[in-house]
Amino acid sequence: MAMKIRLARGGSKKRPHYSIVASDSRMPRDGRFLEKLGTYNPLLAKDSEDRIKMNLERVQYWLAQGAQPTDRVARFLEAAGLKEKAVRNNPKAAVPGKRMAELAKKKADRAAASAE
């Protein structure tokens, strides 16, 4: 059974409130879960203590059982000191696409032709 530690959305329209849960990865986002590990309220100020609440002992237990945190939960765990900071590197994001590369080449050719 592939386990995930992820966010389950609650609250009403335009007023989100999330539960941090341990669940089977095949279950729906807001569906059945095995254990509620904490809460996350994005509407509170970033420096508020009540913004993210987690039962760290149970989170460690589920990580030891092989549960994989989602990206957002992994960031919460990094902030809590339970997980090492992941290196986020995407070198291809800065490389222009084919069309932009062609346009840049044409522009450089025109500049070289006008300089001669």
Curated annotation (Swiss-Prot):
The molecular function terms in GO held by this entry are: structural constituent of ribosome
Which residue ranges does the record annotate as region Disordered?
Answer: 88-116
Identify one Pfam family in the record. Ribosomal_S16
The answer to whether keyword Ribosomal protein applies is yes
Where does this protein have compositionally biased stretches of type Basic and acidic residues?
A: 99-110
Q: Kindly state which keywords UniProt assigns to this record, in alphabetical order.
A: Ribonucleoprotein, Ribosomal protein
Its GO biological process annotations read:
translation
The entry's cellular-component GO terms read: cytoplasm; small ribosomal subunit
Q: Which family is annotated?
A: Belongs to the bacterial ribosomal protein bS16 family.
Give the protein name, as stated in the record. Answer: Small ribosomal subunit protein bS16
- Lineage of producing organism: Bacteria, Pseudomonadati, Pseudomonadota, Alphaproteobacteria, Rhodobacterales
